[in-house]
A protein has these predicted regions:
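Short beta-strand to alpha-helix junction loop
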Residues: 1-8, 113, 182
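A conserved beta-strand/loop element that lines the FAD pocket in flavoprotein oxidoreductases
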Residues: 12-29
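Glycine-rich phosphate-binding loop signature in dinucleotide/nucleotide-binding domains
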Residues: 17-18, 53-60
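Hydrophobic "anchor" residues on beta-strands that sit immediately upstream
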Residues: 22, 58, 62-64, 244
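A conserved short coil-to-beta-strand element within the FAD-binding core of flavoproteins
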Residues: 25-43
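Conserved FAD-binding catalytic core of PHBH/FMO-like flavoproteins
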Residues: 47, 51, 63, 67-220
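FAD/FMN-dependent oxidoreductases across multiple families
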Residues: 174-292
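C-terminal helical "tail/cap" subdomain of flavin- and related membrane-associated enzymes
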Residues: 213-215, 273-416
Length: 416
């Protein structure tokens, strides 16, 4: 992606004599403030620190776009700013840039990657030839261990290049035994016991000793909270300069629903539409007279108002969509996974029986590209409300049948 971005920058600079792009690496944001320029438009002053020598650099811009990840320095600067130096939709409040966080069943899971050779072979049963893997196929390899701290699952996602190295994701709870092993030989022996069919032995094994050592020493990363920032854009008093956030700087969540990249790219599309004075959802000319202006302030205000509800719905989908797909091995996880699977299956069956009157679960609805995240969660909420009414109604009928109206009068104090 970095190489592709560099190629796009070079292509842009070659086609335009002015407004060239300067690509700077090794700097991190320290502070962001609006500045007043006499005789010309105001600008945003960005103070950046060189990560190697600590030297400070000043950059001026009309618009600053924060796309610096879930621990965004740009967002943090806005969250610690004075409430008087910026404006925003319905007034600027630094608290709006402090992300709201929720813990999902997938939050805090640890993940690291083991590199397998391309087209490696999976041993089959005795007397059967091994299965040669293909890059375009998905594979899930389960260990013989089934305990809450030693169960392993090797997940391999499809790849276009059949000759490329196959990375396999190791996703576990933080207390898993694999995180207590820090040298290659011990890690190889652990995997050999967990996957006895695979030739993980030292001489001629499917994985090199160098890779085992790298994998054992790797710390990996952790899945984040489900979080989002209510604030996504600000501007100064004059409305001629501002800041906008996109991608993980606005929203971050575990990769359960497979929408992280799509959501980040959609932020860029929405910001582009807003800066062009278009409706951020439809991409069409706005029909509201008050929003037809195309100044930077009105465009950023449009970007703040329209995507914010969509982002909130996205985070709700991430919390409840598919948090148990990693086969978390704790006993409570296994019970919850069965309940989640039953819930998804029940929704799907009832949707078929009622010809779509009852909607499938939100994770299945999210696969319909024509639906926005708000529409997905609205349909899921309607189905949940329907179930609640049915349960309460059924319980009421059972109580009436079992105890009669006298019991209801006593409990609720209602005159029938």
């Amino acid at each position: 992606m970095v190489k592709l971005m560099a190629e796009c920058i070079d292509e842009h600079n070659a086609q335009h004599e002015s407004c060239n792009i300067t690509f700077v690496m090794g700097q991190e944001c320290v502070d962001i403030l609006p500045t007043k320029n006499v005789g010309q438009s105001n600008s945003v002053c960005v103070t950046a620190r060189n990560v190697e020598d600590g030297s400070l650099h000043i950059h001026h811009a009309t618009l600053v776009v924060g796309a610096d990840g879930m621990n965004s320095k740009v967002r943090q600067c806005l969250a610690t700013s004075s409430s008087t130096i910026w404006n925003s939709h319905k007034g600027f409040s630094p608290k709006k840039f402090e992300p709201k966080r929720w813990t999902s069943p997938a939050s805090h899971l640890r993940i690291k990657v083991l590199q397998l050779p391309p087209q490696f072979e999976i041993p089959d049963g005795e007397g059967k030839p091994p299965i040669k893997t293909k890059g375009e196929n998905i594979y899930a390899l389960r260990s013989i261990n089934t305990g809450p701290r030693n169960y392993l699952s090797l997940g391999l996602l499809p790849m276009k290049d059949n000759t490329a190295v196959r990375p396999t994701n190791i996703v576990t709870r933080p207390d898993h035994e694999v995180w207590t092993i820090h040298d290659g030989p011990s890690m190889r022996q652990y995997f050999q016991k967990a996957f006895p069919r695979f030739p993980f032995e030292k001489d001629g094994g499917v994985i090199s000793e160098e890779e085992w050592d790298r994998f054992a020493k790797a710390q990996g990363t952790r899945f984040p909270h489900c979080q989002y920032s209510e604030g996504v854009a600000v501007w100064d008093d004059s409305g001629t300069c501002g800041v906008a956030l996109v991608g993980d700087a606005v929203h971050a969540f575990p990769p359960d629903i497979g929408q992280g990249v799509n959501a980040g790219l959609m932020d860029v599309v929405c910001l582009d539409r807003a800066l062009k004075g278009l409706d951020t959802v439809t991409g069409k000319e706005t029909t509201v007279e008050s929003t037809k202006e195309k100044t930077l302030q009105t465009n950023l205000e449009r970007y703040q108002k329209q995507p914010a509800p969509e982002i909130a719905a996205l985070i709700r989908l991430a919390r409840f969509g598919a948090p148990y797909q990693y086969n978390q091995p704790h006993r409570a996880d296994r019970i919850s996974e069965k309940m989640w699977t039953a819930n998804v299956a029940l929704h799907l069956i009832l949707s078929k029986l009622t010809f779509g009157l009852i909607q499938p679960s939100c994770i299945l609805l999210s696969q319909k590209g024509e639906l926005t995240f708000r529409q997905v969660m609205r349909r899921a909420d309607l189905t949940t409300a329907f179930f609640k009414v049915m349960v309460v109604g059924g319980l009421g009928l059972w109580v009436r049948q079992r105890f009669g109206f006298g019991f209801l009068k006593t409990v609720f104090g209602v005159m029938f």
